[in-house]
Swiss-Prot record:
Entry-linked SUPFAM superfamilies: P-loop containing nucleoside triphosphate hydrolases
Function, in words: GTPase that plays an essential role in the late steps of ribosome biogenesis.
UniProt xrefs under PROSITE patterns: G_ENGA
Gene Ontology molecular functions: GTP binding; ribosome binding
Record NCBIfam families: GTPase_EngA (TIGR03594), small_GTP (TIGR00231)
Residue ranges annotated for the EngA-type G domain, each copy included: 2-167, 175-351
UniProt similarity note: Belongs to the TRAFAC class TrmE-Era-EngA-EngB-Septin-like GTPase superfamily. EngA (Der) GTPase family.
Gene this protein is translated from: der
Species whose genome carries this gene: Ureaplasma parvum serovar 3 (strain ATCC 700970)
Identification of the protein by name: GTPase Der
Residues that bind GTP 1: 8-15, 55-59, 119-122
Cysteine pairings via disulfide bonds: none
GO annotation, biological process: ribosome biogenesis
HAMAP family given in the database record: GTPase_Der
CDD domains for the chain: EngA1, EngA2
Length: 442
């Protein structure tokens, strides 16, 4: 699959163009320069052609260390790409930063296709010297408005004209999981260690990752997509509109995932905000693995330390009692393999399908062994059970009247199913339904 990178100075509309090509809002757009910090990846499609699209941070000359990191990210993207969109702004005109980028592209991307694109032509007041644009040496250029969609058809035709027809099946086959946690627990360090490269900027500043970033990779011939998300702060600390959108992005990333890695900082006491983020995982009702990061930073460990930490987690995160706990040190690349062992273990459980006859044997026997208590003037009686979904194991239990069900008895039946069929590391869902109400398809 061909790769296209969008580069340019800050605030020329790179993220707006990225979103316009994808036809949805993937990158955060804001008038504040420097909003895009890492490389953002997604698959675009045009005229039955598929391509990988990369949004990058704005390049400027600066002595700031963080800006140096952004510039380095852009160079990574240029190296990965087959085609470069060099974006400038008609509204702001050409300046020295644009000229420096053009020079850099001639040096760093001389063997790649470079397309000069002039954005923001919707502005009533703009002036561009076409002779100056041709002096860049990139030949033909395109005038567009990413915000309003003007000129996009011609640009997209140019981007895909030499591309083979390709579908999106590879993306669909990948097992997708996201990394969540409060700021500064090491989510981006963990992503980088897993990917084996500096794809996400790691910075000691809490909240340095604002976008959710999709990264495709293979691990021992298995295909995965990992989503690194913005750290979720307490509501009182979210003051920027960009930060608010990043929190929404994290929740959307959870919705797109098949599994969650909840990262905790093992080098300090767990905080209330860790529990809040854990609540998002619980509410999502999808498989979750708790990752205790920075394990090597804990001093004076002994043979009992790990078990003590597990007990503390079980106490503070009672609602995730089924979630496996894994201990790693992302910066030192230690015990990372245990994450994938846990992922595959949980994945197998989540996909497990139980025969209806076996389910009924277990549940009917459990119902007979422990008689349900009377509740709301009646006593529940289970007729039969059937599994209606895997991935998140889901069961429908037919009974005489669901209103007679006491929560303690529902928990008893859930535990019996978990124990009998080995669902000890995934969430399961039970729906209690009146036996006279038919399931869809019956």
């Amino acid at each position: 699959m061909r790769t296209i990178a969008i580069v340019g100075k800050p605030n020329v509309g790179k993220s707006s163009l990225f979103n316009r090509i994808l036809m949805r809002r993937k990158s955060i757009v804001d008038d504040q320069p420097g909003v895009t910090r890492d490389r953002i990846y997604d698959i675009g499609n045009w005229l039955t052609r598929s391509f990988m699209l990369i949004d990058t941070g704005g390049i400027i000359s600066s002595k700031d260390t963080y800006q140096d990191n952004i510039n380095e990210q852009v160079l990574f993207a240029i190296n990965e790409a087959n085609t470069i969109i060099f974006l400038v702004s008609a509204k702001d005109g050409i300046n020295n930063d644009d000229k420096k980028i053009a020079k850099m592209l001639k040096e760093k991307a001389k063997d790649k296709k470079i397309i000069l694109v002039i954005n923001k032509i919707e502005s009533e007041k703009y002036y561009l010297n076409e002779g100056e644009l041709y002096s860049f040496g990139f030949g033909k250029f395109f005038k567009i408005s990413a915000e309003h969609g003007i000129g996009m058809g011609d640009l997209l035709d140019e981007l895909v004209k030499d591309m083979p027809i390709q579908n999106n099946l590879e993306k669909q086959e990948r097992f997708k999981f996201c990394i969540i946690g409060r700021p500064n627990v090491g989510k981006s360090s963990l992503t980088n260690t897993i990917l084996g490269e500096q794809r996400v900027i790691v910075n000691a500043e809490a909240g340095s990752t604002r976008d959710s970033i999709d990264n495709d990779f293979n691990y021992y011939n298995k295909k995965y997509t990992i989503i690194d998300t913005a750290g979720i702060r307490r509501k009182g600390k979210i003051v920027e509109s960009v930060e608010k959108y990043a929190v929404l992005r994290t929740k959307k990333a959870i919705e797109r995932s098949q599994l969650i890695l909840l990262v905790l900082d093992g080098s300090e006491p767990f905080k209330e905000q860790d529990e809040v983020v854990g609540g998002l995982a619980y509410n999502a009702n999808i498989p979750t693995i708790i990752i205790v990061n920075k394990w090597d930073n804990i001093i004076n460990k002994n043979s009992h330390t790990m078990e003590m930490v597990k007990k503390q987690i079980r106490s503070q995160f009672k609602y995730l009692s089924w979630a496996p706990i894994v201990f790693v040190s992302a910066l030192d690349n230690k015990r990372i393999h245990t994450i994938f062992e846990a992922i595959e273990f949980v994945r197998e459980q989540a996909m497990r399908k139980i025969a209806t006859s076996l389910l009924n044997d277990v549940v009917i026997k459990a119902n007979a062994f422990q008689e349900p208590p009377p509740f709301k003037g009646g006593r529940i009686s289970i007729s039969y059970i059937v599994q209606v979904q895997s991935q998140i194991p889901t069961f429908v239990l037919k009974c005489n009247n669901p209103k007679f069900l006491h929560f303690s008895y529902a928990r008893y039946i859930e535990n019996e199913i978990r124990k009998a069929f080995g669902f000890d590391s995934v969430p399961i869902t039970l729906y209690w339904q009146d036996k006279n109400k038919k399931l869809r398809g019956e």
